[in-house]
Amino acid sequence: MGAANTGNGHKIATIGSHSALQILYGAKQEGFSTVLICEKGREQPYESYKVADELILVDKFSELLKMQQKLLSEKAILIPHGTFFDAFGLEEVEKLKVPYFGNKKILKWEADRMLQREWLKKAGLTLPKIYKTPEEIDGPVIIKFYGARGGKGFFLARSAEEFYKKIKEREGRSYIIQEYIIGAPIYIHYFYSPLTGELEVMSFDRRYESNVDSIGRIAAKDQLDLGLETSYNITGNLPVVVRESLLPEIFRMGEAAVKASRKLDGDKIGLYGPFSLETVITPDLKFFVFEISARIVAGTNLYINGSPYTDLRYKEPMSTGRRIAREIKRAIEQNNLSLILN
């Protein structure tokens, strides 16, 4: 790992959760000094793995908002991940003064599931049906809640009656009713570089969810006797290598998402950096796209030393976290930081 002297004094900073280990390790691989803002009591992994040159302990992540001047004075660059938006909220993230890797104008399109759907439609991607009211339910559906909370609270229903019975336990949260597509779930990890204009397919994963990934070990009769209800709480991620014949369509979908993003709110910059498409591949090998995450996703943590696909391209360990740091380093070398920071 290179000495921490890269980048004309700039440091890479993030908050201690989600993919912070990967982000900071990747930054150190590219020679950056690193800063971690961590809630008290959660610092042990970061101390053990020694990824943070500076560890700032806080009672709550939201205290970052009060230390922006310190981060500015240290020339810190914030790398967002899923916990950012739960910790601060969309409006506070949009108002951050510390340089931020990514396009903040895209965030509202990711955060609102209906706006996100509009974006994906503009990209010409195939989407599952959305039901406006429970009374429209005419087959299996999955009810999803807004926000990056790891699938918490999602549930299945087959009728309006079943929907109303299950939603009682989850009242007060905004949701969408989405057609349930039978197939293989695949999360595609992309990186788009505004410096080169090139899209990279970094890796793939599938989620390991409780209890849906263990319920199959229980016979159907016993499931009925026990009255088990399927849940989708994410506990981890599993690596995937896709059929090579699927790669052209995977590249096409990513490029379409980036191209469509440049037309959102008249912003010609659009989406850049890491992002992910949540897909299901049906038995006839058709992709349905459920969601887009306009940031690094936790599934990339599988590949801290790179994936089979980054091995082909880089011939050296290249995680998504390291790829972010390399993009920043290149922008500094080209005197073009304004292109990638908000």
Q: Where do the language-model regions lie?
A:
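ATP-dependent carboxylate/phosphate-activation module, predominantly the ATP-grasp catalytic core
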Residues: 190-262, 293-325
